[in-house]
């Protein structure tokens, strides 16, 4: 990088520029239980040594700047600086390295995902000495975890609220996502819930547009929920999207949802922002609302393998900021998601303690202590033939969400919901009887069609539909 140039002054300060690795590359450092640990995929510019690049990341995401400054002498740089404590090559990538960086906990405001990300994934991602930079994983120390409320309620409380156990929950995104009037929208919600689904959902870009203002949608959806509950005897819900242009408008919508008595609201946490999301999560905890999270915009951040931020980091951040559900990919549907990587961050969402496992992309052991878990939502291009695989991959603590796979049924919305509920119940029963969903899945569905004409019709419509593309996000081998 820049040549070393130093100028002595009468007060002992040495001005000029020095290599980052002299201060920020510390391979002998022993990490502390209170450190936030980060694994960065670093692609240095030609001629920049990996140690210098790693130290540059540590410096620029903590206390460093491009030149030596005299005010360094007014604080304990050794106490507050980030440290690159390890560099390892990436298999099959000659120009990429994994740089491990430790950050002292005092660099971060308590319970503020916004502040954590501003430092760790801030200006450093535009640093000229790096061709590309990707944050692969974070280890959040328990001391920092305990400063967060986390999900509004968590998995067990949600099941208790809904009185639904022993199976995945079923959902449906109302389609077309834009253009319906509030009354027609509410009609579709009712038909899906009446047919056997647990939830219906606003699409992520349904806010308050001219064709359907938010208050009208909330009222018609609440009417649909109560009517379906009365007819089925089951607790139902619709994810009312409270995302808005200002935090004040977002909270106004959440308050109105609570006044209507509905069980759940929704937020687009990346486009809405972490500050707004945490504010909404706190309100939901205090007022008995579940909070569904959509990850719109995530692929802008996480899809490129050499630059950006892996979704497992965004998933951890969401668990800290707060949300009871989050979309996580399907493995088998139309959206990106390799199986082992997906299951890795699904465990990070649901479990209390997750061991380091590089075969699933998990770089650090993570202990969430008492932070509630988040239900992963499998959604995007799935239909009844996928039900065995989804049940086997995601297990009971998940939401399986079929939009087109419900509303595209040839007989209508309610029969589409019936088909999905029958398929799910058949898969759960078969699994509980000891059958292998991975190998017997199609046969289990075919058997169920014999006593469900709705399922038989759905199977016929979607029998040839597959999404067979190579995943962009793959493990390093």
From Swiss-Prot:
<dbReference type="InterPro" id="IPR000685">
    <property type="entry name" value="RuBisCO_lsu_C"/>
</dbReference>
<dbReference type="InterPro" id="IPR033966">
    <property type="entry name" value="RuBisCO"/>
</dbReference>
<feature type="binding site">
    <location>
        <position position="173"/>
    </location>
    <ligand>
        <name>substrate</name>
    </ligand>
</feature>
<dbReference type="GO" id="GO:0019253">
    <property type="term" value="P:reductive pentose-phosphate cycle"/>
</dbReference>
<keyword id="KW-0602">Photosynthesis</keyword>
<feature type="active site" description="Proton acceptor">
    <location>
        <position position="294"/>
    </location>
</feature>
<feature type="binding site">
    <location>
        <position position="203"/>
    </location>
    <ligand>
        <name>Mg(2+)</name>
    </ligand>
</feature>
<keyword id="KW-0460">Magnesium</keyword>
<keyword id="KW-0934">Plastid</keyword>
<feature type="modified residue" description="N6,N6,N6-trimethyllysine">
    <location>
        <position position="14"/>
    </location>
</feature>
<keyword id="KW-0456">Lyase</keyword>
<dbReference type="GO" id="GO:0000287">
    <property type="term" value="F:magnesium ion binding"/>
</dbReference>
<dbReference type="InterPro" id="IPR017443">
    <property type="entry name" value="RuBisCO_lsu_fd_N"/>
</dbReference>
<keyword id="KW-0150">Chloroplast</keyword>
<keyword id="KW-0007">Acetylation</keyword>
<feature type="site" description="Transition state stabilizer">
    <location>
        <position position="334"/>
    </location>
</feature>
<comment type="subunit">
    <text>Heterohexadecamer of 8 large chains and 8 small chains; disulfide-linked. The disulfide link is formed within the large subunit homodimers.</text>
</comment>
<keyword id="KW-0560">Oxidoreductase</keyword>
<feature type="binding site">
    <location>
        <position position="177"/>
    </location>
    <ligand>
        <name>substrate</name>
    </ligand>
</feature>
<keyword id="KW-0479">Metal-binding</keyword>
<dbReference type="GO" id="GO:0009507">
    <property type="term" value="C:chloroplast"/>
</dbReference>
<keyword id="KW-0601">Photorespiration</keyword>
<feature type="binding site">
    <location>
        <position position="204"/>
    </location>
    <ligand>
        <name>Mg(2+)</name>
    </ligand>
</feature>
<feature type="binding site">
    <location>
        <position position="327"/>
    </location>
    <ligand>
        <name>substrate</name>
    </ligand>
</feature>
<feature type="propeptide">
    <location>
        <begin position="1"/>
        <end position="2"/>
    </location>
</feature>
<dbReference type="Pfam" id="PF00016">
    <property type="entry name" value="RuBisCO_large"/>
</dbReference>
<keyword id="KW-1015">Disulfide bond</keyword>
<dbReference type="GO" id="GO:0009853">
    <property type="term" value="P:photorespiration"/>
</dbReference>
<dbReference type="GO" id="GO:0004497">
    <property type="term" value="F:monooxygenase activity"/>
</dbReference>
<feature type="binding site" description="in homodimeric partner">
    <location>
        <position position="123"/>
    </location>
    <ligand>
        <name>substrate</name>
    </ligand>
</feature>
<keyword id="KW-0488">Methylation</keyword>
<keyword id="KW-0503">Monooxygenase</keyword>
<dbReference type="InterPro" id="IPR020878">
    <property type="entry name" value="RuBisCo_large_chain_AS"/>
</dbReference>
<dbReference type="InterPro" id="IPR036422">
    <property type="entry name" value="RuBisCO_lsu_N_sf"/>
</dbReference>
<feature type="binding site" description="via carbamate group">
    <location>
        <position position="201"/>
    </location>
    <ligand>
        <name>Mg(2+)</name>
    </ligand>
</feature>
<feature type="modified residue" description="N-acetylproline">
    <location>
        <position position="3"/>
    </location>
</feature>
<feature type="binding site">
    <location>
        <position position="379"/>
    </location>
    <ligand>
        <name>substrate</name>
    </ligand>
</feature>
<feature type="modified residue" description="N6-carboxylysine">
    <location>
        <position position="201"/>
    </location>
</feature>
<keyword id="KW-0120">Carbon dioxide fixation</keyword>
<dbReference type="Pfam" id="PF02788">
    <property type="entry name" value="RuBisCO_large_N"/>
</dbReference>
<dbReference type="GO" id="GO:0016984">
    <property type="term" value="F:ribulose-bisphosphate carboxylase activity"/>
</dbReference>
<protein>
    <recommendedName>
        <fullName>Ribulose bisphosphate carboxylase large chain</fullName>
        <ecNumber>4.1.1.39</ecNumber>
    </recommendedName>
</protein>
